[in-house]
């Protein structure tokens, strides 16, 4: 049976995550307030950031950057785009 949460990202009820996706207090906040669709959107955005900025998940500075972007993306709706990013037609 799936959980329903009020997704902060989508501003509507959504299917909740099956598990805490990130360690610590931030992970608990994500689990309680973010739906599966929003989490998948973050994973795609994170992949773009890693690829375009040539980030290494092993580098503590890069991990800190990604955590900041995670919070901005899911809870503030103003995450950075890579330099020179051009959205495909039909996207914001």
UniProtKB/Swiss-Prot annotation:
Q: Which SUPFAM superfamilies match?
A: YggX-like (SSF111148)
Superkingdom of the source species: Bacteria
Q: Which InterPro entries match?
A: Fe_traffick_prot_YggX, Fe_traffick_prot_YggX_sf
Molecular function terms in GO for this entry? iron ion binding
The keyword Thylakoid belongs to this UniProt entry's keyword annotation: no
Q: Which GO terms describe its biological process?
A: cellular response to oxidative stress
* Key words of the record: Iron
**Gene Ontology CC: one annotated term:** cytosol
Has the keyword Iron been applied to this entry? yes
- Kindly give the Pfam families that the UniProt entry links to this protein: Iron_traffic
The Swiss-Prot or TrEMBL record describes its family as follows: Belongs to the Fe(2+)-trafficking protein family.
* Functional summary from the UniProt entry: Could be a mediator in iron transactions between iron acquisition and iron-requiring processes, such as synthesis and/or repair of Fe-S clusters in biosynthetic enzymes.
Xref: NCBIfam families: PRK05408.1
This chain belongs to which protein, by name? Probable Fe(2+)-trafficking protein
Originating organism: Xanthomonas oryzae pv. oryzae (strain KACC10331 / KXO85)
